[in-house]
């Protein structure tokens, strides 16, 4: 693959010029709410550009996995319908953090263009910002002035988001010749088809704040980005990015699966392009730990998948098919991105599960759409309210609604639909908007030099000094008795909450006062904040104090954290290597671990996992902490790291028996310290995500003892020896089953006898028999039995209406024989019209519906109403 060669040669070029090759970060940013997905190579270096983080290197080069499908950079709707838009792409880049600036950046770019990309220099053009005289002068060394263009902010000022690093940029373009347009220069090339941009050099000089102010960065930096797919297309001289290399390989696989030949100019061509692109976004996102869902990134991922499925239907795919494309993707990209190869099973399982669910949604929504079409027959137009309900409530995409409506020559009230869409998005935005609370703001406003040294790995107590105090969300100089607030220490043994582990609690004290620490947090890098209340006396800044962590709670939390590591490894060994941690929480009482898995764990699975963890506890292996180079971890398959987590050059590895994980938390000294491990609960938390809750030590023993007490009580109640409880319970259950069958048989006999009487009470109109009948409250418990029995006796041309009372409300059941539903008679329509005047509500299908109402008329009136309704329906 040409892309593999280009990627490798690009990285080698910069590595040979003292750039550190840095692995691609995941396709979603870590702790950055300003963007949904990683959309540029510089995302992982944002804090370095801002001067918030330090790194051992000042030059870097990457090939970054990117997704643009949400937020400011959103290409989703264009994919498939243009020659270059993609949701997933690779961004080649080189970066300078206060090292070189414009001169070397431009010099390198020119050399790469000629020696790595093999472009003819006579066809290269450059643009610069209209105010960037320096960049213009530098390009004059390589290009004639008539091939250098000055442009405005719109084209040559770059920013990652509304806030953050930004600066002037310079773009490189390649002239593809007159067959791609008659424009004589980039200024005339409105569509950008002839003079194709292939590289953007961003000169980071500013940090844009939320009010739009441009502040000078502490260090001038360089960020460049060249889209790999676009480069491949240029070198292969294809009209679109889809006709070369990886994407064409995927299209070939889709051709094979669908039995349809790809033609770029035919309408079906868009379907091939959409699927080829979307399978990459989906696969890499899942490999990096994301899953389709109903909110934020998960929602976008689900939207991408459903868009691929909808386009797949145009190629004849009426069953899950995306998983079948994944191996072809791994064949061509798995070597460059090992996480893709390691996650094949997980990717395929998630895709198939989501597709199956969506096909069911389409079927259910399609049935509802048929009802909407029928009710809209007079206007031949689907209302915006109905279209929105089908999409919002039943998950039927508007594209699917439009296609089905087109088949019936129906229009859709898109103005109302779009208005409702906007209103829904606004409600969602208000509900999910994360507002920065006052205390967070205070922490950000603290002096940057006001940092804390953490020494809590080695000690639980130390003498230190108060560096800062916060009271009532404001910076203060003192705390008085009863005040709630926060204290910042120069040195602290308190572990701040992170990595899923709760923060420490304890005391900060001196002769003047005692501060009870309830929780410890790290609101920003280098800052540890102790939250709590002053129980007695007073404390002031600069005061010498003693910091003492609650030893018992720390020990129990550490044991649980090590237990969580053992659980994670046991899950992988029991269920398979597809297991990925999707979240965790550890405190002194419990372990909570979320992991990727598509089905509930059996009792046998849970027992095997619990047994394996306890075996490792009994082996009493020492828990060893090592600090190693992250580059060494990247080359090791034995050490677990977590997608989305950001790591520095030196990382902390926790070795606990068979478990090897990157972790910054506190741990037991040996696995035997954990004592005993017990799973307390296992359940689903989202599609493809399961959760295990567990505990260790004394808490686990208490659970076991409690269950033993329960067994003794059960044995007493059922009058059975303890070792015979299960036998006795099974015997009782069999007896209960037999009795239930006898009761059901008797009830059925009673129903049958009464139905024979009711047959003589049926009336008739328009060749249709009907019955309205009140059941007593006791009879009402068998309301469905009555309806089933009489409709079995009268299988055609029959409508029945059953009424009973329960908890002060009328319960109403309507039934319609199957042959009448084919003539347009609907049970739910009948019941809805019947209950509407009385404020009742109902739900159901064409053949059967049930509802309730606080009021109902006499049976004679209902009988008359039903008779009139049948006459109207079947006239």
From Swiss-Prot:
Keyword Metal-binding: yes
Binding residues annotated for Zn(2+), in chain numbering: 561, 565, 663, 667
Assigned keywords, A-Z: Aminoacyl-tRNA synthetase, ATP-binding, Cytoplasm, Ligase, Metal-binding, Nucleotide-binding, Protein biosynthesis, RNA-binding, tRNA-binding, Zinc
Family: Belongs to the class-II aminoacyl-tRNA synthetase family.
InterPro entries from the UniProt entry: aa-tRNA-synth_II/BPL/LPL, Ala-tRNA-lgiase_IIc, Ala-tRNA-ligase_IIc_anticod-bd, Ala-tRNA-synth_IIc_core, Ala-tRNA-synth_IIc_N, Ala-tRNA_ligase, Ala_tRNA_ligase_euk/bac, DHHA1_dom
Protein's recorded name: Alanine--tRNA ligase
Cross-referenced NCBIfam families: alaS (TIGR00344)
Pfam families hit by this protein: DHHA1, tRNA-synt_2c, tRNA_SAD
Subcellular location: Cytoplasm
Species this chain originates from: Chlamydia trachomatis serovar L2 (strain ATCC VR-902B / DSM 19102 / 434/Bu)
Reactions listed under catalytic activity: tRNA(Ala) + L-alanine + ATP = L-alanyl-tRNA(Ala) + AMP + diphosphate
CDD domains tied to this protein: AlaRS_core
Cofactor(s) named in the record: Zn(2+)
GO MF term set: alanine-tRNA ligase activity; aminoacyl-tRNA deacylase activity; ATP binding; tRNA binding; zinc ion binding
Function: Catalyzes the attachment of alanine to tRNA(Ala) in a two-step reaction: alanine is first activated by ATP to form Ala-AMP and then transferred to the acceptor end of tRNA(Ala). Also edits incorrectly charged Ser-tRNA(Ala) and Gly-tRNA(Ala) via its editing domain.
């Amino acid at each position: 693959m040409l892309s593999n060669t280009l990627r490798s040669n690009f990285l080698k070029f910069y590595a040979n010029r003292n750039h550190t090759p840095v692995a691609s970060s995941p396709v979603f940013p870590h702790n950055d709410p300003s963007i949904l997905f990683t959309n540029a190579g510089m995302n992982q270096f944002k804090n370095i550009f801002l001067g918030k983080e330090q790194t051992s290197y000042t030059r870097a080069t990457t090939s970054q996995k990117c997704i643009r499908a949400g937020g400011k950079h959103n290409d989703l709707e264009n994919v498939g319908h243009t020659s270059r838009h993609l949701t997933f792409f690779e961004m080649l880049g080189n970066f300078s953090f206060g090292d070189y600036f414009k001169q070397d950046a431009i010099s390198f770019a020119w050399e790469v263009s000629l020696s790595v990309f093999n472009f003819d220099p006579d066809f290269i053009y450059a643009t610069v910002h209209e105010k960037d005289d320096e960049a213009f002068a530098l390009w004059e060394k390589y290009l004639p002035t008539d091939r250098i263009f000055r442009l405005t902010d719109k084209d040559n000022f770059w920013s990652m988001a509304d806030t953050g690093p930004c600066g002037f940029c310079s773009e490189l373009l390649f002239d593809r010749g007159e067959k791609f347009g008659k424009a004589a220069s980039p200024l005339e090339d409105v569509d950008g088809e002839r003079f194709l941009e292939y590289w953007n050099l961003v000169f980071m000089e500013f940090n844009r704040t939320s009010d739009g102010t441009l502040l000078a960065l502490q260090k001038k930096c360089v960020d460049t980005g060249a889209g790999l797919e676009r480069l491949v297309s240029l070198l292969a001289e294809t009209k679109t990015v889809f006709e070369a290399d990886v994407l064409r390989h995927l299209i070939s696989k889709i051709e094979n699966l669908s039995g349809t030949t790809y033609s770029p100019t035919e309408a079906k061509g868009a379907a091939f392009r959409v699927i080829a692109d979307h399978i990459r976004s989906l696969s890499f996102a899942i490999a990096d730990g994301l899953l389709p869902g109903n909110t934020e990134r998960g929602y976008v991922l689900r939207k991408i998948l459903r868009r691929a499925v909808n386009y797949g239907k145009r190629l004849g795919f009426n069953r899950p098919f995306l998983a079948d494309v994944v191996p072809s993707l791994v064949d061509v990209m798995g070597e460059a991105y090992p996480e893709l190869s390691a996650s094949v099973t997980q990717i395929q399982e998630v895709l198939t599960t989501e597709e199956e669910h969506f096909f069911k949604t389409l079927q259910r929504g399609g049935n509802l759409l048929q009802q909407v079409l029928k009710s809209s027959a007079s206007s031949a137009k689907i209302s915006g309210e109905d279209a929105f309900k089908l999409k919002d409530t039943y998950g039927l995409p508007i594209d699917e609604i439009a296609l089905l409506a087109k088949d019936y020559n129906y229009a859709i009230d898109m103005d109302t639909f779009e208005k409702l869409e906007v209103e829904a998005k606004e409600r969602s935005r208000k509900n999910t908007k994360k507002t920065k609370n006052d205390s967070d703001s205070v922490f950000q406003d603290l002096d940057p030099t006001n940092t804390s040294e953490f020494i809590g790995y080695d000690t639980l107590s130390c003498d230190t000094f108060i560096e800062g105090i916060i009271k009532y969300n404001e910076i203060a100089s003192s705390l008085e008795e009863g005040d709630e607030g926060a204290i910042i220490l120069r040195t602290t043994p308190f572990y701040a909450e992170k990595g899923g582990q709760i923060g420490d609690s304890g005391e900060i004290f001196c002769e003047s006062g005692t501060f009870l620490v309830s929780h410890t947090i790290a609101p920003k890098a280098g800052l540890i904040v102790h939250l709590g209340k002053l129980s007695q006396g007073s404390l002031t800044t600069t005061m010498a104090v003693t910091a003492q962590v609650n030893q018992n709670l720390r020990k129990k939390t550490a044991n649980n954290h090590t237990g969580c590591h053992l659980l994670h490894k046991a899950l992988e060994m029991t269920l398979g290597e597809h297991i990925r941690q999707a979240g965790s929480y550890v405190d002194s009482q419990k372990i909570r671990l979320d992991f990727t898995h598509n089905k509930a764990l059996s009792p046998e699975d849970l027992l095997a996992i619990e047994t394996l963890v306890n075996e490792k506890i009994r082996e009493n292996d020492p828990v060893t902490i090592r600090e190693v180079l992250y580059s060494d971890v990247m080359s090791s398959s034995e050490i677990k790291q977590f997608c989305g987590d950001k790591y520095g050059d030196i990382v902390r590895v926790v070795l606990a028996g068979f478990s090897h994980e990157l972790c910054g938390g506190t741990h037991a000294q040996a696995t035997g310290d954990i004592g005993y491990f017990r799973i307390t609960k296992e359940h689903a938390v989202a599609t493809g995500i399961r959760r295990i809750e567990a505990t260790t030590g004394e808490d686990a023993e208490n659970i076991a003892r409690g269950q033993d007490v329960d067994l003794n009580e059960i044995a007493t109640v059922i009058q059975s020896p303890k070792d015979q409880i299960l036998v006795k319970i099974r015997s009782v259950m069999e007896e209960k089953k037999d009795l239930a069958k006898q009761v059901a048989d008797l009830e059925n006999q009673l129903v049958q006898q009464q139905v024979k009487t009711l047959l003589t009470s049926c009336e008739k109109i328009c060749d249709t028999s009907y019955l309205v009948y009140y059941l007593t409250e006791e009879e009402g418990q068998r309301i469905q039995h009555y309806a089933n029995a009489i409709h079995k006796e009268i299988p055609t041309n029959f409508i029945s209406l059953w009424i009973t009372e329960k908890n002060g409300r009328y319960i109403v059941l309507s039934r319609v024989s199957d042959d009448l539903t084919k003539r347009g008679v609907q049970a739910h329509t009948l019941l809805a019209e019947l209950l509407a005047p009385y404020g009742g509500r109902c739900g159901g299908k064409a053949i059967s519906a049930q509802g309730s109402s606080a009021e109902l008329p006499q049976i004679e009136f209902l009988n008359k109403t039903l008779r009139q309704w049948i006459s109207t329906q079947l006239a």
